[in-house]
From Swiss-Prot:
<dbReference type="GO" id="GO:0004399">
    <property type="term" value="F:histidinol dehydrogenase activity"/>
</dbReference>
<keyword id="KW-0862">Zinc</keyword>
<feature type="binding site">
    <location>
        <position position="369"/>
    </location>
    <ligand>
        <name>Zn(2+)</name>
    </ligand>
</feature>
<keyword id="KW-0479">Metal-binding</keyword>
<dbReference type="InterPro" id="IPR012131">
    <property type="entry name" value="Hstdl_DH"/>
</dbReference>
<keyword id="KW-0028">Amino-acid biosynthesis</keyword>
<feature type="binding site">
    <location>
        <position position="267"/>
    </location>
    <ligand>
        <name>substrate</name>
    </ligand>
</feature>
<feature type="binding site">
    <location>
        <position position="369"/>
    </location>
    <ligand>
        <name>substrate</name>
    </ligand>
</feature>
<comment type="pathway">
    <text>Amino-acid biosynthesis; L-histidine biosynthesis; L-histidine from 5-phospho-alpha-D-ribose 1-diphosphate: step 9/9.</text>
</comment>
<dbReference type="GO" id="GO:0005829">
    <property type="term" value="C:cytosol"/>
</dbReference>
<protein>
    <recommendedName>
        <fullName>Histidinol dehydrogenase</fullName>
        <ecNumber>1.1.1.23</ecNumber>
    </recommendedName>
</protein>
<feature type="active site" description="Proton acceptor">
    <location>
        <position position="335"/>
    </location>
</feature>
<feature type="binding site">
    <location>
        <position position="428"/>
    </location>
    <ligand>
        <name>Zn(2+)</name>
    </ligand>
</feature>
<dbReference type="InterPro" id="IPR016161">
    <property type="entry name" value="Ald_DH/histidinol_DH"/>
</dbReference>
<dbReference type="InterPro" id="IPR001692">
    <property type="entry name" value="Histidinol_DH_CS"/>
</dbReference>
<dbReference type="Pfam" id="PF00815">
    <property type="entry name" value="Histidinol_dh"/>
</dbReference>
<feature type="binding site">
    <location>
        <position position="270"/>
    </location>
    <ligand>
        <name>substrate</name>
    </ligand>
</feature>
Amino acid sequence: MSLTLRKLDSADAGFAAQLRQVLAFEASEDEAIDRAAAQILADVKVRGDAAVLETTLRFDRVEADSVAALELSPVVLQAALDGLEPTRRAALEAAAARVRAYHEKQKIECGTHSWEYAEADGTVLGQKVTPLDRVGIYVPGGKAAYPSSVLMNAIPARVAGVKEIIMVVPTPGGVRNELVLAAACIAGVDRVFTIGGAQAVGALAYGTETVPAVDKIVGPGNAYVAAAKRRVFGTVGIDMIAGPSEILVICDGTTDPDWVAMDLFSQAEHDELAQSILLCPDAGFIAQVEASIRRQLDDMPRKEVIAASLSGRGALIQVRDMDEACEIANDIAPEHLEISAENPRQWAERIRHAGAIFLGKYTSESLGDYCAGPNHVLPTSRTARFSSPLGVYDFIKRSSLIEVSEAGAQMLGEIASELAYGEGLQAHARSAEYRLQRTTTE
Protein backbone atom coordinates (compact mmCIF):
# COMPACT_ATOMS: atom_id res chain seq x y z
CA MET A 1 0.00 0.00 0.00
CA SER A 2 1.30 3.42 -0.95
CA LEU A 3 1.79 5.83 1.95
CA THR A 4 3.64 9.11 1.55
CA LEU A 5 4.06 11.06 4.77
CA ARG A 6 4.74 14.75 4.34
CA LYS A 7 7.47 15.91 6.76
CA LEU A 8 8.05 19.62 7.33
CA ASP A 9 10.40 21.70 9.44
CA SER A 10 9.32 25.12 10.70
CA ALA A 11 12.94 26.31 10.48
CA ASP A 12 12.96 25.93 6.69
CA ALA A 13 12.71 29.14 4.66
CA GLY A 14 9.71 27.94 2.70
CA PHE A 15 7.78 26.54 5.67
CA ALA A 16 4.94 29.09 5.64
CA ALA A 17 4.13 28.34 2.00
CA GLN A 18 4.42 24.61 2.61
CA LEU A 19 2.01 24.81 5.54
CA ARG A 20 -0.48 26.81 3.48
CA GLN A 21 -0.36 24.09 0.84
CA VAL A 22 -1.09 21.44 3.47
CA LEU A 23 -4.02 23.42 4.84
CA ALA A 24 -5.43 24.42 1.45
CA PHE A 25 -8.93 23.11 1.06
CA GLU A 26 -11.80 24.54 -0.89
CA ALA A 27 -15.16 22.96 -0.22
CA SER A 28 -16.44 21.37 -3.37
CA GLU A 29 -18.86 23.70 -5.08
CA ASP A 30 -19.90 21.42 -7.88
CA GLU A 31 -22.37 23.40 -9.96
CA ALA A 32 -24.17 20.24 -10.99
CA ILE A 33 -24.74 19.29 -7.35
CA ASP A 34 -25.91 22.80 -6.49
CA ARG A 35 -28.33 22.85 -9.43
CA ALA A 36 -29.69 19.42 -8.54
CA ALA A 37 -30.21 20.44 -4.91
CA ALA A 38 -31.93 23.66 -6.01
CA GLN A 39 -34.29 21.75 -8.29
CA ILE A 40 -35.19 19.29 -5.56
CA LEU A 41 -35.82 22.10 -3.07
CA ALA A 42 -38.03 23.96 -5.53
CA ASP A 43 -39.99 20.80 -6.24
CA VAL A 44 -40.53 20.04 -2.55
CA LYS A 45 -41.57 23.64 -1.90
CA VAL A 46 -44.26 23.44 -4.58
CA ARG A 47 -45.42 19.81 -4.46
CA GLY A 48 -44.68 18.85 -0.88
CA ASP A 49 -45.21 15.20 -0.02
CA ALA A 50 -45.44 14.08 -3.65
CA ALA A 51 -41.96 15.42 -4.40
CA VAL A 52 -40.54 13.83 -1.25
CA LEU A 53 -41.97 10.44 -2.20
CA GLU A 54 -40.63 10.60 -5.75
CA THR A 55 -37.10 11.59 -4.75
CA THR A 56 -37.02 9.03 -1.94
CA LEU A 57 -37.90 6.30 -4.44
CA ARG A 58 -35.34 7.63 -6.90
CA PHE A 59 -32.38 8.00 -4.56
CA ASP A 60 -33.04 5.56 -1.70
CA ARG A 61 -35.05 2.94 -3.60
CA VAL A 62 -37.79 3.13 -0.99
CA GLU A 63 -41.38 3.12 -2.23
CA ALA A 64 -44.21 4.32 0.00
CA ASP A 65 -47.83 5.28 -0.50
CA SER A 66 -47.47 8.36 1.69
CA VAL A 67 -44.90 10.31 3.66
CA ALA A 68 -46.82 9.29 6.76
CA ALA A 69 -45.79 5.71 5.97
CA LEU A 70 -42.16 6.85 6.18
CA GLU A 71 -42.57 8.09 9.74
CA LEU A 72 -41.42 5.77 12.51
CA SER A 73 -43.58 5.56 15.61
CA PRO A 74 -42.23 5.82 19.16
CA VAL A 75 -42.96 2.10 19.47
CA VAL A 76 -40.47 1.39 16.67
CA LEU A 77 -37.83 3.56 18.34
CA GLN A 78 -38.35 1.87 21.70
CA ALA A 79 -38.14 -1.54 20.05
CA ALA A 80 -34.81 -0.56 18.51
CA LEU A 81 -33.52 0.40 21.94
CA ASP A 82 -34.87 -2.74 23.58
CA GLY A 83 -33.32 -4.89 20.87
CA LEU A 84 -29.76 -3.71 21.47
CA GLU A 85 -27.20 -6.05 22.96
CA PRO A 86 -27.00 -5.12 26.68
CA THR A 87 -23.43 -3.80 26.69
CA ARG A 88 -24.10 -1.71 23.56
CA ARG A 89 -27.24 -0.25 25.14
CA ALA A 90 -25.41 0.50 28.37
CA ALA A 91 -22.66 2.31 26.46
CA LEU A 92 -25.19 4.37 24.50
CA GLU A 93 -27.11 5.30 27.65
CA ALA A 94 -23.91 6.19 29.52
CA ALA A 95 -22.77 8.42 26.67
CA ALA A 96 -26.17 10.11 26.53
CA ALA A 97 -26.12 10.74 30.28
CA ARG A 98 -22.71 12.40 30.08
CA VAL A 99 -23.68 14.53 27.08
CA ARG A 100 -26.85 15.59 28.88
CA ALA A 101 -25.02 16.46 32.11
CA TYR A 102 -22.46 18.59 30.27
CA HIS A 103 -25.09 20.54 28.35
CA GLU A 104 -27.20 21.07 31.46
CA LYS A 105 -24.13 22.65 33.06
CA GLN A 106 -23.57 24.65 29.88
CA LYS A 107 -27.13 25.96 30.07
CA ILE A 108 -26.42 27.38 33.52
CA GLU A 109 -23.04 28.88 32.70
CA CYS A 110 -23.42 30.25 29.17
CA GLY A 111 -25.98 33.01 29.38
CA THR A 112 -29.03 31.00 28.44
CA HIS A 113 -31.36 32.66 30.95
CA SER A 114 -33.41 35.84 30.74
CA TRP A 115 -32.25 38.87 32.71
CA GLU A 116 -33.18 42.50 33.33
CA TYR A 117 -32.20 45.51 35.39
CA ALA A 118 -33.88 48.78 36.41
CA GLU A 119 -32.40 52.24 35.95
CA ALA A 120 -32.78 55.03 38.50
CA ASP A 121 -35.74 56.61 36.66
CA GLY A 122 -37.66 53.31 36.58
CA THR A 123 -36.81 52.27 33.03
CA VAL A 124 -36.29 48.50 32.80
CA LEU A 125 -33.93 46.94 30.26
CA GLY A 126 -33.11 43.31 29.74
CA GLN A 127 -33.08 40.26 27.55
CA LYS A 128 -35.65 37.51 27.15
CA VAL A 129 -34.25 34.09 26.25
CA THR A 130 -36.59 31.71 24.43
CA PRO A 131 -35.97 28.18 23.13
CA LEU A 132 -36.68 27.53 19.47
CA ASP A 133 -40.10 26.02 18.84
CA ARG A 134 -39.08 23.24 16.45
CA VAL A 135 -35.72 21.91 15.27
CA GLY A 136 -34.86 19.48 12.50
CA ILE A 137 -31.95 17.07 12.85
CA TYR A 138 -30.42 15.52 9.76
CA VAL A 139 -28.73 12.18 10.40
CA PRO A 140 -26.78 10.44 7.62
CA GLY A 141 -27.87 6.93 6.72
CA GLY A 142 -26.24 3.88 5.19
CA LYS A 143 -22.52 3.37 5.83
CA ALA A 144 -22.15 6.85 7.35
CA ALA A 145 -24.65 6.25 10.15
CA TYR A 146 -23.44 7.74 13.41
CA PRO A 147 -25.67 7.26 16.48
CA SER A 148 -23.30 9.50 18.45
CA SER A 149 -24.30 12.38 16.18
CA VAL A 150 -27.93 11.84 17.15
CA LEU A 151 -27.00 12.34 20.79
CA MET A 152 -24.81 15.37 20.09
CA ASN A 153 -27.48 17.15 18.05
CA ALA A 154 -30.67 16.18 19.86
CA ILE A 155 -29.66 16.34 23.51
CA PRO A 156 -28.54 20.02 23.54
CA ALA A 157 -31.80 20.93 21.80
CA ARG A 158 -33.78 19.06 24.41
CA VAL A 159 -31.80 20.61 27.28
CA ALA A 160 -32.36 24.06 25.75
CA GLY A 161 -36.11 23.48 25.94
CA VAL A 162 -36.94 23.06 22.24
CA LYS A 163 -40.59 22.05 22.08
CA GLU A 164 -40.33 19.58 19.20
CA ILE A 165 -37.39 17.76 17.60
CA ILE A 166 -37.89 16.25 14.15
CA MET A 167 -35.27 13.82 12.87
CA VAL A 168 -34.79 12.76 9.26
CA VAL A 169 -32.60 9.81 8.34
CA PRO A 170 -32.38 8.09 4.95
CA THR A 171 -32.73 4.32 4.80
CA PRO A 172 -31.18 3.27 1.46
CA GLY A 173 -32.87 0.14 0.22
CA GLY A 174 -35.19 0.29 3.21
CA VAL A 175 -32.43 -0.78 5.62
CA ARG A 176 -32.69 0.89 9.01
CA ASN A 177 -29.81 1.42 11.41
CA GLU A 178 -31.18 0.20 14.73
CA LEU A 179 -28.46 1.92 16.76
CA VAL A 180 -29.39 5.28 15.24
CA LEU A 181 -33.05 4.71 16.07
CA ALA A 182 -32.14 3.64 19.60
CA ALA A 183 -30.12 6.83 20.01
CA ALA A 184 -33.13 8.86 18.87
CA CYS A 185 -35.22 7.16 21.54
CA ILE A 186 -32.69 7.88 24.28
CA ALA A 187 -32.15 11.48 23.16
CA GLY A 188 -35.85 12.31 23.24
CA VAL A 189 -36.49 12.91 19.54
CA ASP A 190 -40.21 13.51 18.99
CA ARG A 191 -40.71 12.39 15.38
CA VAL A 192 -38.53 10.44 12.93
CA PHE A 193 -38.98 10.34 9.14
CA THR A 194 -36.98 7.92 7.01
CA ILE A 195 -36.17 10.44 4.31
CA GLY A 196 -32.85 11.99 3.39
CA GLY A 197 -30.98 14.10 0.89
CA ALA A 198 -31.94 17.55 -0.33
CA GLN A 199 -35.60 16.51 -0.25
CA ALA A 200 -35.43 16.02 3.52
CA VAL A 201 -33.81 19.43 3.97
CA GLY A 202 -36.54 20.97 1.82
CA ALA A 203 -39.28 19.23 3.76
CA LEU A 204 -37.88 20.52 7.05
CA ALA A 205 -37.33 24.04 5.73
CA TYR A 206 -40.62 24.58 3.91
CA GLY A 207 -42.88 21.99 5.47
CA THR A 208 -45.11 19.58 3.57
CA GLU A 209 -48.54 18.14 4.17
CA THR A 210 -46.94 15.68 6.59
CA VAL A 211 -43.54 17.01 7.65
CA PRO A 212 -43.79 20.17 9.77
CA ALA A 213 -41.57 23.14 8.95
CA VAL A 214 -38.82 23.72 11.50
CA ASP A 215 -36.99 26.82 12.68
CA LYS A 216 -33.47 25.43 12.41
CA ILE A 217 -31.74 22.47 10.75
CA VAL A 218 -28.65 20.88 12.26
CA GLY A 219 -26.61 17.81 11.46
CA PRO A 220 -24.12 16.59 8.84
CA GLY A 221 -24.79 15.21 5.37
CA ASN A 222 -23.35 14.65 1.93
CA ALA A 223 -22.65 17.27 -0.73
CA TYR A 224 -26.33 17.47 -1.73
CA VAL A 225 -27.39 18.00 1.87
CA ALA A 226 -24.73 20.68 2.33
CA ALA A 227 -25.83 22.46 -0.86
CA ALA A 228 -29.46 22.31 0.26
CA LYS A 229 -28.62 23.68 3.71
CA ARG A 230 -26.79 26.61 2.14
CA ARG A 231 -29.83 27.42 0.02
CA VAL A 232 -32.45 27.24 2.77
CA PHE A 233 -30.41 29.36 5.18
CA GLY A 234 -32.44 32.48 5.80
CA THR A 235 -35.71 30.61 5.55
CA VAL A 236 -34.46 28.58 8.50
CA GLY A 237 -31.34 28.68 10.61
CA ILE A 238 -28.58 26.12 10.16
CA ASP A 239 -25.73 25.02 12.38
CA MET A 240 -22.80 25.08 9.95
CA ILE A 241 -21.50 23.69 6.67
CA ALA A 242 -18.86 21.32 7.97
CA GLY A 243 -15.75 20.42 6.03
CA PRO A 244 -13.58 17.30 6.40
CA SER A 245 -12.63 16.23 9.91
CA GLU A 246 -9.35 17.51 11.38
CA ILE A 247 -6.98 16.66 14.21
CA LEU A 248 -3.86 18.54 15.26
CA VAL A 249 -1.64 16.93 17.89
CA ILE A 250 0.89 19.03 19.79
CA CYS A 251 3.28 16.66 21.55
CA ASP A 252 6.40 17.27 23.63
CA GLY A 253 7.70 13.76 22.97
CA THR A 254 6.65 12.22 26.28
CA THR A 255 3.62 10.27 25.01
CA ASP A 256 3.80 6.73 23.66
CA PRO A 257 4.29 7.17 19.88
CA ASP A 258 1.80 4.37 19.22
CA TRP A 259 -0.85 6.44 21.00
CA VAL A 260 -0.09 9.48 18.89
CA ALA A 261 -0.12 7.46 15.67
CA MET A 262 -3.52 6.00 16.50
CA ASP A 263 -4.88 9.44 17.38
CA LEU A 264 -3.83 10.62 13.92
CA PHE A 265 -5.55 7.55 12.45
CA SER A 266 -8.76 8.37 14.34
CA GLN A 267 -9.51 11.28 12.04
CA ALA A 268 -7.79 9.98 8.93
CA GLU A 269 -10.15 7.00 8.87
CA HIS A 270 -13.18 9.27 8.36
CA ASP A 271 -12.47 9.97 4.69
CA GLU A 272 -9.71 10.72 2.23
CA LEU A 273 -10.02 14.49 2.77
CA ALA A 274 -9.66 14.33 6.56
CA GLN A 275 -6.58 16.04 7.95
CA SER A 276 -4.16 14.76 10.63
CA ILE A 277 -1.13 16.84 11.64
CA LEU A 278 1.54 16.40 14.32
CA LEU A 279 3.56 19.30 15.76
CA CYS A 280 6.57 18.30 17.86
CA PRO A 281 9.99 19.81 18.68
CA ASP A 282 11.63 16.36 19.01
CA ALA A 283 12.87 14.99 15.67
CA GLY A 284 13.55 11.59 17.19
CA PHE A 285 10.01 11.31 18.49
CA ILE A 286 8.58 12.30 15.10
CA ALA A 287 10.59 9.44 13.57
CA GLN A 288 9.10 7.05 16.14
CA VAL A 289 5.58 8.21 15.29
CA GLU A 290 6.26 7.72 11.59
CA ALA A 291 7.53 4.20 12.24
CA SER A 292 4.44 3.46 14.33
CA ILE A 293 2.15 4.74 11.58
CA ARG A 294 3.74 2.44 9.04
CA ARG A 295 3.71 -0.52 11.44
CA GLN A 296 0.10 -0.16 12.59
CA LEU A 297 -1.49 0.81 9.29
CA ASP A 298 -1.84 -2.70 7.89
CA ASP A 299 -3.89 -3.76 10.91
CA MET A 300 -6.54 -1.11 10.32
CA PRO A 301 -9.76 -2.17 8.53
CA ARG A 302 -9.93 1.26 6.85
CA LYS A 303 -6.24 1.33 5.95
CA GLU A 304 -6.86 2.49 2.37
CA VAL A 305 -8.79 5.53 3.56
CA ILE A 306 -6.23 6.29 6.26
CA ALA A 307 -3.33 6.03 3.81
CA ALA A 308 -5.05 8.30 1.29
CA SER A 309 -5.86 10.87 3.99
CA LEU A 310 -2.36 10.93 5.48
CA SER A 311 -0.71 11.04 2.05
CA GLY A 312 -2.97 13.76 0.72
CA ARG A 313 -3.50 16.11 3.67
CA GLY A 314 -1.43 14.84 6.60
CA ALA A 315 1.86 16.20 7.92
CA LEU A 316 4.52 15.53 10.55
CA ILE A 317 6.00 18.91 11.47
CA GLN A 318 9.10 19.56 13.52
CA VAL A 319 8.89 22.89 15.36
CA ARG A 320 11.54 24.86 17.23
CA ASP A 321 9.77 24.54 20.58
CA MET A 322 6.35 24.16 22.18
CA ASP A 323 5.79 27.92 22.08
CA GLU A 324 6.05 27.86 18.31
CA ALA A 325 3.79 24.81 18.21
CA CYS A 326 1.08 26.85 19.94
CA GLU A 327 1.55 29.74 17.50
CA ILE A 328 1.16 27.41 14.53
CA ALA A 329 -1.85 25.75 16.16
CA ASN A 330 -3.57 29.13 16.46
CA ASP A 331 -2.94 29.74 12.78
CA ILE A 332 -4.35 26.34 11.82
CA ALA A 333 -7.38 26.75 14.15
CA PRO A 334 -8.13 23.01 14.10
CA GLU A 335 -11.38 21.22 14.74
CA HIS A 336 -9.72 18.92 17.30
CA LEU A 337 -6.53 19.92 19.13
CA GLU A 338 -4.72 17.43 21.34
CA ILE A 339 -2.04 18.78 23.66
CA SER A 340 -0.24 15.58 24.58
CA ALA A 341 2.36 16.90 27.00
CA GLU A 342 3.47 16.65 30.62
CA ASN A 343 2.00 20.05 31.47
CA PRO A 344 -0.84 20.50 28.97
CA ARG A 345 -2.56 23.39 30.75
CA GLN A 346 0.57 25.50 30.46
CA TRP A 347 0.27 25.31 26.69
CA ALA A 348 -3.54 25.44 26.60
CA GLU A 349 -3.36 28.96 28.00
CA ARG A 350 -1.71 30.01 24.73
CA ILE A 351 -4.39 28.51 22.50
CA ARG A 352 -6.96 30.94 21.11
CA HIS A 353 -8.43 29.06 18.17
CA ALA A 354 -9.62 25.44 18.33
CA GLY A 355 -12.97 23.69 18.19
CA ALA A 356 -12.13 21.39 21.10
CA ILE A 357 -8.96 21.12 23.19
CA PHE A 358 -7.95 17.72 24.56
CA LEU A 359 -5.51 18.03 27.46
CA GLY A 360 -2.97 15.39 28.43
CA LYS A 361 -1.86 12.06 27.05
CA TYR A 362 -4.87 10.17 28.42
CA THR A 363 -7.36 12.41 26.61
CA SER A 364 -7.78 10.85 23.20
CA GLU A 365 -9.93 12.70 20.71
CA SER A 366 -12.14 9.63 20.35
CA LEU A 367 -13.34 10.04 23.94
CA GLY A 368 -14.69 13.43 22.98
CA ASP A 369 -16.34 11.99 19.89
CA TYR A 370 -18.43 9.59 21.91
CA CYS A 371 -18.81 10.02 25.60
CA ALA A 372 -16.74 12.69 27.40
CA GLY A 373 -19.72 15.06 27.34
CA PRO A 374 -18.80 18.17 25.32
CA ASN A 375 -20.30 18.35 21.85
CA HIS A 376 -18.47 16.73 18.95
CA VAL A 377 -20.10 19.01 16.36
CA LEU A 378 -17.18 21.40 15.87
CA PRO A 379 -16.06 24.12 13.46
CA THR A 380 -13.72 22.96 10.68
CA SER A 381 -11.63 24.54 7.91
CA ARG A 382 -10.19 27.27 10.19
CA THR A 383 -13.67 28.51 11.16
CA ALA A 384 -12.73 27.93 14.81
CA ARG A 385 -11.28 31.45 14.51
CA PHE A 386 -14.84 32.75 14.79
CA SER A 387 -17.13 29.78 15.47
CA SER A 388 -17.93 27.53 18.41
CA PRO A 389 -19.01 23.94 19.03
CA LEU A 390 -22.70 23.16 18.78
CA GLY A 391 -24.31 23.83 22.13
CA VAL A 392 -27.42 24.74 24.07
CA TYR A 393 -26.93 28.34 22.93
CA ASP A 394 -27.58 27.26 19.32
CA PHE A 395 -31.14 26.27 20.20
CA ILE A 396 -32.22 29.48 21.90
CA LYS A 397 -32.81 33.02 20.73
CA ARG A 398 -32.69 36.32 22.55
CA SER A 399 -35.16 39.19 22.49
CA SER A 400 -34.30 42.62 23.89
CA LEU A 401 -36.62 43.94 26.61
CA ILE A 402 -37.27 47.68 26.90
CA GLU A 403 -39.82 49.17 29.30
CA VAL A 404 -39.39 52.96 29.46
CA SER A 405 -40.79 54.85 32.42
CA GLU A 406 -42.48 58.24 32.13
CA ALA A 407 -39.34 59.93 33.41
CA GLY A 408 -37.19 57.83 31.13
CA ALA A 409 -39.22 58.88 28.10
CA GLN A 410 -38.32 62.51 28.82
CA MET A 411 -34.59 61.87 28.78
CA LEU A 412 -34.49 59.25 26.01
CA GLY A 413 -36.98 61.14 23.84
CA GLU A 414 -34.74 64.18 23.59
CA ILE A 415 -31.76 62.03 22.57
CA ALA A 416 -33.73 59.96 20.08
CA SER A 417 -35.44 62.90 18.38
CA GLU A 418 -32.16 64.77 17.94
CA LEU A 419 -30.50 61.74 16.33
CA ALA A 420 -33.56 60.98 14.18
CA TYR A 421 -33.66 64.51 12.75
CA GLY A 422 -29.97 64.14 12.00
CA GLU A 423 -30.76 61.03 9.96
CA GLY A 424 -33.68 62.71 8.20
CA LEU A 425 -36.28 60.40 9.76
CA GLN A 426 -38.98 62.79 10.89
CA ALA A 427 -41.51 60.15 11.91
CA HIS A 428 -38.96 58.59 14.24
CA ALA A 429 -38.33 61.98 15.81
CA ARG A 430 -42.02 62.83 16.09
CA SER A 431 -42.78 59.45 17.69
CA ALA A 432 -40.26 60.19 20.43
CA GLU A 433 -41.46 63.79 20.81
CA TYR A 434 -45.08 62.74 21.32
CA ARG A 435 -43.96 61.07 24.54
CA LEU A 436 -42.20 64.29 25.54
CA GLN A 437 -45.34 66.32 24.91
CA ARG A 438 -47.54 63.91 26.81
CA THR A 439 -45.15 63.89 29.74
CA THR A 440 -45.00 67.69 29.93
CA THR A 441 -48.74 68.31 29.47
CA GLU A 442 -50.17 65.63 31.73
